[in-house]
């Protein structure tokens, strides 16, 4: 699934961990979706400015994508 209308950045990554790191590097990023596939190579990573639970009306099922909320980490 993805969140329509709140895209911050669309980029290519090697895996979900890299997509999550890109989200963590941007203060405006609240969640991300990454393309999943068994084939090697780059995958599409979409960073969002909101979380699905705050905008459920904008959640769209998109085949081949896995959604993640950005973890809140305090140092």
Predicted segments with their positions:
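Extracellular disulfide-rich cysteine clusters
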Residues: 1-75
């Amino acid at each position: 699934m993805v969140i329509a209308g709140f895209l911050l950045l669309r980029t290519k990554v090697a895996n979900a961990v890299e997509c999550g790191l890109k989200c963590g590097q941007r203060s405006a990023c609240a969640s991300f979706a990454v393309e999943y596939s068994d084939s090697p190579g780059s995958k599409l990573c979409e960073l969002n400015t909101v979380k699905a639970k705050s905008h459920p009306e904008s959640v769209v099922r998109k085949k081949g994508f896995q959604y993640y909320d950005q973890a809140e980490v305090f140092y």
